[in-house]
Amino acid sequence: MAQQTPLYEQHTLCGARMVDFHGWMMPLHYGSQLDEHHAVRTDAGMFDVSHMTIVDLHGSRTREFLRYLLANDVAKLTKTGKALYSGMLNASGGVIDDLIVYYFTEDFFRLVVNSATREKDLSWITQHAEPYAIDITVRDDLSLIAVQGPNAQEKAATLFTDEQRHAVEGMKPFFGVQAGDLFIATTGYTGEAGYEIAMPNEKAADFWRALVEAGVKPCGLGARDTLRLEAGMNLYGQEMDEGISPLAANMGWTIAWEPADRDFIGREALEMQREKGHEQLVGLVMTEKGVLRNELPVRFTDAQGNQQEGIITSGTFSPTLGYSIALARVPAGIGETAIVQIRNREMPVKVTKPVFVRNGKAVA
């Protein structure tokens, strides 16, 4: 039996089409995925992301523990509320999960991890935390709502108290603050400005209804996927998993190689991959008719004249751009063009950086 978030009833009242998403009943859309997508790019939309897991870590050695657990380095986190994106890797350098870590005090950090990987994440974290005497609290008492779009912060702020408005005033991206009973973070998964707001479960339904009244459009998983793909953001299980290195998933920037004496899980394997060479994640654009879909083969001839083949990890029609885009994992050495096999047709595609839209504007 699939689980329900505290907002399940609100979704049905808003006319959502519900689907089972990794064991959670979640809204796919509320009538028009396209309208929801455009609302986030041009105004404000909101997503129930309460299926994600918030994990609080307490203990005097929490920073030391996270410097070992994560490929990125929490030594960078010195300002209260600052957030960091990182992979959590296994010994062979594969990605167990990608997550966000927040720093509050030396003995209090917070992780936000994916729903699909919840059980293995918690098991892995608990196993490795033991020598560091970390107190781990899974915050199943909290719901999480993402409000995203150019007008999202302004509309969300109409629900805040004076204290909360003051707390978020001038807050830069990738920060979070606890203000009253809300944890408000300037993070998201759409390429737009906005907030991700955690609150007690019993407050979530009222907060959702108030956002609807403030003119924020409910959005489902369908729009969430096209928005994150336009923004070039990875989806766990597609761009990366336990068998795929962050180096092959456009996550090289999340690996803190310095200081060289910091030991983190997967470091040795990554150093070997870096020396030997590895696959890369690229963007693909197809302006001709048709849609680039997951798992389609991508072919190109490298500089040595050898035929090479990769695979599309995520593909869709881009509502913002009006043509098809994709992320693809390919061997090193791809040029500016490639061929994608769609049924029995070979379609030419342009190879780009793996990001297509930022703040509502085309970058590909």
Swiss-Prot record:
It catalyses: N(6)-[(R)-S(8)-aminomethyldihydrolipoyl]-L-lysyl-[protein] + (6S)-5,6,7,8-tetrahydrofolate = N(6)-[(R)-dihydrolipoyl]-L-lysyl-[protein] + (6R)-5,10-methylene-5,6,7,8-tetrahydrofolate + NH4(+). Its EC number is 2.1.2.10. GO terms for cellular component: cytosol; glycine cleavage complex. The keyword Transferase applies. GO terms for biological process: glycine decarboxylation via glycine cleavage system. GO terms for molecular function: aminomethyltransferase activity; transaminase activity. Disulfide bonds: none annotated. Pfam families: GCV_T, GCV_T_C. It comes from the Bacteria. Gene3D superfamilies: Aminomethyltransferase beta-barrel domains (3.30.70.1400), Aminomethyltransferase fragment (4.10.1250.10), Probable tRNA modification gtpase trme, domain 1 (3.30.1360.120). Keywords: Aminotransferase, Transferase. NCBIfam families: gcvT (TIGR00528), PRK00389.1 (NF001567). The glycine cleavage system catalyzes the degradation of glycine. Belongs to the GcvT family. The glycine cleavage system is composed of four proteins: P, T, L and H. This is Aminomethyltransferase.
